């Protein structure tokens, strides 16, 4: 990620900061698309290396190899990056709005939670453990009848102005708040 060119796993590991425990990877249609994923923001801010997977079958590599040397693979789109010092936001003050988001969005998301990894972005979708969004796309193209779905976790930056607007609207204008919820989900799906 720091050099945005093809690298071997050996080169990647040699450039990893000492405190980086995992081989982080993120997938997308292009280097530019991966580079702009909200989920990678915290890793990049910490100068962590990220493998950019741009081929549809790249996402199968971590499942096949699991490790390289003593380093395990971990998706940047997973819910927990296991950085050790990730700031977990206080949710007690925001739980009603998080519940409102889940209720409004229904089955389109499996879970809504406050995020400790977002900084400048209001929301992102993570897949948790198991199937990723890129794998879902791959299987949909190869076998459309299979209907395999990745888990969709909407992570929300409770310190972002967009969340503050949603929280205010939830109290004063619930119909407007529902529109904000739709906008946030659409933003996360981009």
Region annotations inferred by a language model:
Residues 1-190:
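Long, intrinsically disordered, charge-dense linkers/tails
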């Amino acid at each position: 990620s720091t050099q945005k060119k093809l690298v071997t796993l050996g080169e990647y590991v040699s450039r990893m900061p000492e405190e980086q425990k995992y081989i982080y990877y993120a997938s997308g249609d292009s280097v530019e698309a991966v580079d702009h994923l909200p989920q990678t923001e915290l890793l990049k801010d910490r100068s962590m290396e990220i493998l950019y997977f741009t081929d549809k079958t790249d996402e199968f590599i971590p499942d096949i190899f699991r490790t390289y040397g003593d380093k395990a693979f971990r998706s940047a789109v997973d819910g927990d990056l296991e950085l050790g010092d990730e700031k977990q936001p206080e949710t007690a003050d925001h739980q009603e709005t998080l519940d409102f988001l889940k209720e409004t969005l229904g089955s389109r998301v499996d879970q809504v939670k406050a995020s400790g990894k977002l900084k400048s972005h209001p929301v992102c979708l993570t897949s948790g453990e198991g199937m990723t969004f890129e794998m879902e796309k791959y299987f949909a193209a190869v076998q459309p009848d299979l209907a395999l779905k990745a888990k969709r976790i909407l992570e929300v930056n409770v310190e972002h102005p967009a969340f503050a607007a949603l929280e205010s609207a939830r109290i004063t204008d619930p119909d407007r708040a529902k529109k904000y919820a739709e906008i946030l989900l659409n933003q996360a799906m981009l």
